[in-house]
Amino acid sequence: MDTPPMQRSTPQRAGSPDTLELMDLLDAAAAAAEHRARVVTSSQPDDLLFGENGVMVGREHEIVSIPSVSGLQPEPRTEDVGEELTQDDYVCEDGQDLMGSPVIPLAEVFHTRFSEAGAREPTGADRSLETVSLGTKLARSPKPPMNDGETGRGTTPPFPQAFSPVSPASPVGDAAGNDQREDQRSIPRQTTRGNSPGLPSVVHRDRQTQSISGKKPGDEQAGHAHASGDGVVLQKTQRPAQGKSPKKKTLKVKVPLPARKPGGPVPGPVEQLYHVLSDSVPAKGAKADLPFETDDTRPRKHDARGITPRVPGRSSGGKPRAFLALPGRSHAPDPIEDDSPVEKKPKSREFVSSSSSSSSWGSSSEDEDDEPRRVSVGSETTGSRSGREHAPSPSNSDDSDSNDGGSTKQNIQPGYRSISGPDPRIRKTKRLAGEPGRQRQKSFSLPRSRTPIIPPVSGPLMMPDGSPWPGSAPLPSNRVRFGPSGETREGHWEDEAVRAARARYEASTEPVPLYVPELGDPARQYRALINLIYCPDRDPIAWLQNPKLTGVNSALNQFYQKLLPPGRAGTAVTGSVASPVPHVGEAMATGEALWALPHAAAAVAMSRRYDRAQKHFILQSLRRAFASMAYPEATGSSPAARISRGHPSPTTPATQAPDPQPSAAARSLSVCPPDDRLRTPRKRKSQPVESRSLLDKIRETPVADARVADDHVVSKAKRRVSEPVTITSGPVVDPPAVITMPLDGPAPNGGFRRIPRGALHTPVPSDQARKAYCTPETIARLVDDPLFPTAWRPALSFDPGALAEIAARRPGGGDRRFGPPSGVEALRRRCAWMRQIPDPEDVRLLIIYDPLPGEDINGPLESTLATDPGPSWSPSRGGLSVVLAALSNRLCLPSTHAWAGNWTGPPDVSALNARGVLLLSTRDLAFAGAVEYLGSRLASARRRLLVLDAVALERWPRDGPALSQYHVYVRAPARPDAQAVVRWPDSAVTEGLARAVFASSRTFGPASFARIETAFANLYPGEQPLCLCRGGNVAYTVCTRAGPKTRVPLSPREYRQYVLPGFDGCKDLARQSRGLGLGAADFVDEAAHSHRAANRWGLGAALRPVFLPEGRRPGAAGPEAGDVPTWARVFCRHALLEPDPAAEPLVLPPVAGRSVALYASADEARNALPPIPRVMWPPGFGAAETVLEGSDGTRFVFGHHGGSERPSETQAGRQRRTADDREHALELDDWEVGCEDAWDSEEGGGDDGDAPGSSFGVSIVSVAPGVLRDRRVGLRPAVKVELLSSSSSSEDEDDVWGGRGGRSPPQSRG
């Protein structure tokens, strides 16, 4: 029949909420129609549908086809059904239910359902199933929202917009419909507690508003249509195959139902529909009005493959299925606007699980105390789950007895549970009386509880159960921690390398790059690492990833690698991911949570999973997380710049590590006393009232020379603050020169450390040093002295420590607070650097050095010159002497003029000062302030300061200067062992390396000078070059035959002026010979000594060394002198560089490192290397040989040797070298003989005719030690000279070089 057209809305997808709810109503209406055919009643509530005034009487509500209701055409779905679900949607019966065939759209379901009707005339029931439309009626029947007292009520469902008219030609058969319903009634009906996928319930109920199904084990065969408290289940069927029962699909929709009284009847579908329409609870007599036949009302069976959300579980094949309903989207169409808005209560999150194929969704996944338990009714097959117990859900109704007697309703935030409550992942059900309990299987993939578990914030960090960590027991006295938790190894405290490393560790203020348990005191290393992590100008990630072990640290690392081979258990688990970080067992044993920060930072730094930006993000997160523990008293964004950790208070948290250096703290206290020992000279008007109360107290002065009696009583002035106080007893208490930084900030002209902003080349000074402050008035009184040049006085205001020292040397007085300084001479020597360059802006290069004890650029004191033994020589630590020797291009040995122990006066560095080079010692007054002042002064003039740091890293002062990276900074420590004779004292002379010096870019010498000179040329292109490594840069004051304080080198003119007149006309030849050095060696201890040498180059003029580059790493040339290439040893053995104050250093190609010069033949070496420098004496100056004398009396004779009275014969003999002899010589030592002949043919003796038949070489003369060394004796006794020279015979050449390699001791020939 025809139906009036209805406005067609936007088609909905299959499975939309309104369509499925309509299907539920259709099933209920079908059952009601069957009942109406048997029992005719007109006054009962169920006539509301089909009665006289029923909803479905009108023609306009009768003919609506199922495809129009669904609004979609059939389309196959092959994707997984759980992919579009949300958490607030629906729950699944079991994980295995999702493994079936895909979901069939509703249009296809209904087409299949009614396809068997054929062309027969549809009955009223079939017509009602086919053409029911309740949309208009439902949408126009608004009801008030459910309140707490009403059970099972909800808001009015929205109008289903999928309704549309359809052609009346749809064939519907009554018989088919009856047969189909008969088949369906014979199958047990299954219910769920969730809605269809992606389809929120029409009536949104509160979490605790639940209906209770009265179904018991055995009611499944009761024969009446049953619905659970959460909703009515509608089914879909497919066309049955030949001889097989039809295979059906399951669609589940939630319909709110009223609570059932204990023992009451089970509400049927019509009663449920009536409840939805009337929004009221059925009357007590509803049971008589709704008689159902047991043979027609059997529950219908489903194949347990409905549209349900994914939940954790296992499929039948054992493969885990992780389906989870996520919160979120509502796929329902927008309802038609109505006068009464639809109110929907939000649904809470539900976390559900499935543990096995036999489990039911009736088991709750929430906690019994936190979440209401759901109802699970029905089974996959008839009677398969008849024995399953069900946990009823509590209802909001007061008269409902379905609530568990022991359960209480709680409003817990979804997703959270109590820490002390039971595990929500364990399914819990209510056992029936007399039913044995069953053990539920736990789910393995549930989301864990998000309840924060916060450990105690105070006290040591223990395990969650409060027990100590594994391996925290005290260790035996001879064991240290190593490897996994609880494992140890033997300690090696007595090893020499370990003892040296421990000494360096105790003296260092920075974290050591290699920490071993034998060093002890891990708190010091942890504190240093934490300071490094929070340092704003350092890169802890780069340093922790590669601390660059060099020198002694590398040797110590190799020692432990050999000591602990890869067979130990600790090779896989070492307890520390980076070498600077101590074993984590130390932190676990002490329970120090803060010590985990270096381990976490090191783990991030060593990880390959993050790039640089990601690592620094994690580092910044760690800084924020641990800031409250590392700096508990911090109040700003930069805690490392404002916290003083040197003075622990009684309120210091347990997580704060103690001060790692008590001795350093004591030294700092002498400069900047703690807060309880400081006071300000006067109040500042700009200070807040709170800060004034802290600084108004008169406190003890920390100055060493200040004498303050214990009974001094000073009363405050009653009048103006500026007036002096009234003295009641005792002398006046002098105010301290240095106080703490005022709370309102320092004055612009006050005395404090000016730390430049941004990245720094040097370590950041401590917070205590930065808090020291001196008032401008005090500075003016302290620096107003002729000792301090006016131009350099601002540098003193940059160093409060220097001001405190100046104040300590001034005695106090009654009227004059700052008298003349005591110890003027000592103070003058410490500020002598201010007189090197008058104007600070004329400084171009700043050289920083660390002098040895006893070294002073001002020379030795006159009073202690005779008694003071002088400085002690150190072969490993370079001080002022090594620095000046490198600048003057000469050797520095204990017997040379360059060593400070031989000085009788101050060295002269005026030549360097004239070119803008300032030498500053770490012990000079205001050392830190001078560097920071020069950096600030030149930066303000937009100029860059060149800084050459000759201080070893471990010798850097604790609160040293902070130098900005705006300036040029080169670190090149001075190393005495760069000289071959110091590095190999036993073999350097025999190998020909007596005057060889190894150069490196990281060693103070020509290589590092080249970097500075290049930068200088770029910054100051129009100025005179620095010329650092030149003989004329430094002049020494030593004792020579010209006098006890002779400035050397003494020029030849000065030598003739001051020395020769004393011996003019002298008749005593012995005295004349002693005074002029007649017959003495030309050079003694590398300096010109004889008369002809002094008359030519000047007295004390030094020979120049030969520099051999060895790469960036010092010591890379090899552990022995023989490791130096042969061509380098041959060159150094024959080379003799005469004194030249303006000559550049002679640097050969590298002998070690990345680029090593390799020569395949002697000719290649001759062409690549420069000619061997030699000393040639013109006629009339005596013998042609040049004699050198060492400190041990050994003489080296350089010249032409092996001459003969028959020149032609000798020359012919030289030319008659047979091929056999040449091959034999090269076989013995190819390099030695080849290089010698090659250079001799160009330079040497046999060709110039001066010494026929000879060649140029060196001979070693052995004499008694010290005989030829004494310069104050008369004529030296004659000595026996054993000549060892290179001659023109191949037989002699073999003897000269000692066979292959030239490493045999020299042999004398008769």
Curated annotation (Swiss-Prot):
GO terms for molecular function: DNA binding. One of its GO terms (cellular component) is host cell nucleus. It is found in: Host nucleus; Host cytoplasm; Virion tegument. A motif (Nuclear localization signal) lies at residues 677-685. Signal peptide: none annotated. Residues 1228-1250 have a biased composition (Acidic residues). Its main location: host cell. GO terms for biological process: DNA-templated viral transcription; positive regulation of DNA-templated transcription. It comes from the Viruses. Phosphorylated by ORF66 protein kinase on Ser-686 and Ser-722. Also phosphorylated by ORF47 protein kinase and by human CSNK2A1/CKII. The modification Phosphoserine is found at S686, S722. Residues 351-364, 392-407, 648-666 have a biased composition (Low complexity). Changing K548E: Complete loss of DNA-binding. Transcriptional transactivator. May interact with and recruit specific components of the general transcription machinery to viral promoters and stabilize their formation for transcription initiation. Negatively regulates its own transcription. This immediate early (EI) protein may be necessary in virion for viral pathogenesis. Encoded both by ORF62 and ORF71 within the inverted repeat sequences bounding the Us region of the VZV genome. Interacts with IE4 and IE63. Interacts with host USF1 and SP1. Belongs to the herpesviridae ICP4 family. This is Major viral transcription factor ICP4 homolog.
